[in-house]
Curated annotation (Swiss-Prot):
Protein family (similarity comment): Belongs to the universal ribosomal protein uS2 family.
GO molecular function terms attached to this record: structural constituent of ribosome
NCBIfam families, per database record: rpsB_bact
Subcellular location: Plastid, Chloroplast
Domain of life: Eukaryota
Alphabetical UniProt keywords: Chloroplast, Plastid, Ribonucleoprotein, Ribosomal protein
Protein name: Small ribosomal subunit protein uS2c
Native source species: Bigelowiella natans (Pedinomonas minutissima)
Amino acid sequence: MNFELKNFNTIRINKNQTILIKTTNLENSSKEDTYQFILKMLKAGVHFGHKIKKWNPKMSPFIYQKLQGIHIIDIIQSYTYLKKACKLVYSKSLTDNYNTFLFVGTKKQSPIPNSIFYHASRCNSFYINNKWLSGMLTNWENTTRSINTLKYLKVYQKTNMFSKLSMKTHSIIDKKKNRLEKYFGGIQNMTSLPSTVILVGQHNEITASKECRKLGINNITILDTDCNPEFVDLFIPANDDSSSSLNLILGELQVAINIGRQKFCENLKTWKNSSSILKQI
């Protein structure tokens, strides 16, 4: 499918089909940069929603039109909300709490788990991409206990004492370690609650979303046309089923985190080499 941005009011998909888009909320920063980025979003399929019969009416403000039986997401709002989310994670990453981001997406038989793992790893963040266990955040003491057990078993398996155990005992320990690795491997180095959770696949992550709200943790969620925007602090209306759409959005968030951390390190170096009186306060 070839896209052409005729101007900031229409998108021509082919000779016979044109999608209209809103421009009222579009920032006047750099028209050319915005033009190119929106084109990039369109090529990634960010604007494709679900079939009309599967929609959630609460997503109505973010749906612009119907096309061939599916809802088309307002691409300008997708762009605007993605920009807001990137600004938030960038500002968060400027602090000295280095590992404060948790990526969550566990929907099986979808590109979500792989995208979550890839982009979390690229910005040295934590992730849960297998299953969200109830109380993962709200019962942090129990989660920490499981993480410590996982770490202990990993070390124990390398000792001479472990090598002397029977094969049956080896099997029991392996199964326990593998189970803990499955659920806690992506957060095994997380020593405290995250400041920001990035969620993909809202229907599968309702428990995670509720735990974030209960604890006052910032929650950024990619919302497709079948989702509910009332459950999250900040959301990005976008296609959450396509790997190209997910990789574009999560990739931008990942880059924003890395740039913020790089900026923090540069400022920290300048700060340490400074003789400013502010260091005495």
